Amino acid sequence: MGTYGEFTDIAALQDCHNPFDAFALHKAALIACGIIPAEGGSLNSITDRIGGLYLSTQMHNVPKGSGLGTSSILAGACVKALFKYFGLPCTEPDLYNHAMCMEQIMSTGGGWQDQVGGMTEGIKYITSAPGNRQILSVRHISVPEPALRELQERFALIYTGQRRLARNLLRDVVGRYLGNNPDSLYALEEIQRMAAMMVFELERGNIDGFAELLNKHWELSKMIDAGSTNTCIDQIFAAIEDLLDGKMICGAGGGGFLQVILKKNVTKEMLRERLHETFEDCGVDVWNCTLV
């Protein structure tokens, strides 16, 4: 973004509730990691103790509002950098919890799924027990090597050309849940079951079965929040329906990226050509991606 700022007033550093502030994430990292208090205090006394601090972040080629969890991943990177700077050990739970705390401080909402998904390698099945303190269980899925290669070949990311802010969508989802909306409660229960079934199909090496479940997950997501899709997303999926075995949004939806499983013998170049023919000069495109 090429944005630079200097802060000599602690109140300005503590003001991190605007997610459009270029430095909101950096400020939240300082508060979440206990470098500065959430309110009050003296910046001079803090800098005298730690000798000042220069915090620089870079993120290349990923648009804002992508749905790929980049803000949570960048939050985790800030946490890890601060822990290392002060010579403190940093476990994976430390990363997850501090990143989630930062999101609450910035008022963007969210949970732990983005940081766990983005900062831990591999395909994972992530669960937590009920309660205010979220203790996570991260299980790495063992996918047979031939199936993993097939998934890499058939999996594609499509950018919609639209930006969305997850905070607004998440508030709608939480509101429907707290209001005991029957469709939302049913869909949330089914999504948990769907995730376990996806693990089963991946461990069997059944990519077609996984793709079918991805489609069901997409229908359930729309039951939870109609804002997860829009005219643009519907048109993109309609234009490439004959090329796909599975489709789903990334993140909260409403823009950002879409994830798809291509039919066998359909290449990403064929997908790209179809999108370019249908959507000219509007940012809709296939992005290169690799499973790690």
Predicted feature locations:
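C-terminal nucleotide
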Residues: M1-R49, K84-T91, N97-G109, Q115-I249, ...
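Glycine/charged-rich beta-loop-alpha catalytic/anionic-binding loops adjacent to active sites
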Residues: F7-Q14, L53-K64
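Short linear Ser/Thr-Pro motifs
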Residues: D9, M59, T70-S72, S221
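DPxDG-like acidic metal-binding loop motif
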Residues: S66-L88
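Short glycine/threonine-rich catalytic loop with a Thr-x-Gly-x-Asp
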Residues: L68-T70, K247-A252
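Conserved glycine-rich beta-strand-loop-beta hairpin in the small C-terminal domain of fold type I
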Residues: G256
